[in-house]
């Protein structure tokens, strides 16, 4: 499900920079897919200020031919738990998470996006990471954890401190799940502390903020560069990182225990 709010226009300066960078790109990216999970607390069609930053990033992806999609997890009934499908357990009658996981599985680049509340990522973002973690026992075709070879990043907005704290937690979580994190994989915008204007409010200065636009641009290009390298090289090499091989006694650089010989 995608939001129906209007896209945030790029500033003229950012549009010119993006056009120039696209013309001199070192590779083609049109076979890549990027998914934004907008972990706003607002259900569609309520305005999401986080979507404003997403639109800037989305435009840079699309200028390079990357296929993009935006989903608001809050629009779905996502059960709590660590199962693959909690509707198959006695605890829950319904679980929409498998629909979202299917979209995640089909993408090369995942950008988790959240607003800051009480210095933390949103409760929706936390549940998304919990559900993703519930799939980490599954393996890919090479016998690695299933999300090896995918790229992860984060975009954050708010009116209080916490962007770097949220990014630290989100990027670690994605890495732990199996994602590869590029350099400078976080970008964010903070308005005036307190009840000041939010990103999309008139006069906020958000869409024109040079620091946010620079970091968002670096984030998107680094995601594309890394995804390109991973895709062209078949992902992460399958050596020394396969759980079943380890359990079978093939412990790279360690002697097999006596009972495995």
How would you label these PLM feature ranges?
Residues 1-142, 206, 210-261:
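N-terminal beta1-alpha1-beta2 submodule of the flavodoxin-like/Rossmannoid cofactor-binding fold
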Residues 48, 141-194, 211-214:
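Short, glycine-/small-residue-rich phosphate/pyrophosphate-handling segment
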Residues 196-204:
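Short, surface-exposed amphipathic charged segments that create phosphate/polyanion-binding patches used
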